[in-house]
Amino acid sequence: MQQSLIRDFAHVTVWIFDLDDTLYPPEDALFPQVSAKMSEWLMRHLHVDATEAARLRDYYWRKHGTTLAGLMAEHGIDPWDFLNDVHDVDLSALRPDPVLAAAIARLPGRKIIHTNADCIYAERVLAARGLSGFDAILGIGEAGWHPKPDLRAYDAIRAAVGFDPVEAAMFEDAPRNLAVPFSQGMRTVLVGPGCDGPKGLPMPPEAMAHITHRTPDLTEFLHRLAQGLAPVAL
């Protein structure tokens, strides 16, 4: 199994990581804070109650990909007003993870963050986790305000970084965000239990044919991988 895993990634020179619930455990309960703030923002600015805010968020997620994308498309909001508010969260639950940091550092090639959040928030989270050395941190603004799983988001990131998708691997906790990378030829790694959507429901197996690898433990997966991969010339 170890040799098969190494063969599957031997060609990879670009490693792309999602942020929330991928580079820290979901049990750190950071995203629930963000989620609550999103609902509060809708209640405050759209003058709706909690039930309607939840309904709108589900609708925006299904139609536009994210709550922010829906608000921009249907209400023309300033994205920074929203992002600065919902990402003002307590990061004290996050702890440095030197083992994960070392595993990422050992991967041969470039390491990229691609998140639907903004770069300022991403940098705060990475600092709290003790993760550094990424070649690029690309957020929703760098993706032209197109969120994953929108094809335009991936195209914008690829244009910004400059890489061949067949030489890349992407790590994500949301199954649907790996469909486009898979179609472009990337290795796709689902991190965690494989839940998706605002309700956190597990995805049925037939809906995950675009997942090439799965792991409940990103650190252990990367450690096994890095052990057998040789450095690449960039």
Segments predicted by a language model, with ranges:
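N-terminal helical cap/lid subdomain that shapes the substrate entry/recognition surface
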Residues: 7-17, 22-99, 119-120
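Short glycine/serine/threonine/alanine-rich loop segments
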Residues: 48, 77, 109, 163, ...
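Residue-level marker of regulatory loop/turn positions in helix-turn-helix DNA-binding domains and
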Residues: 96, 114, 146
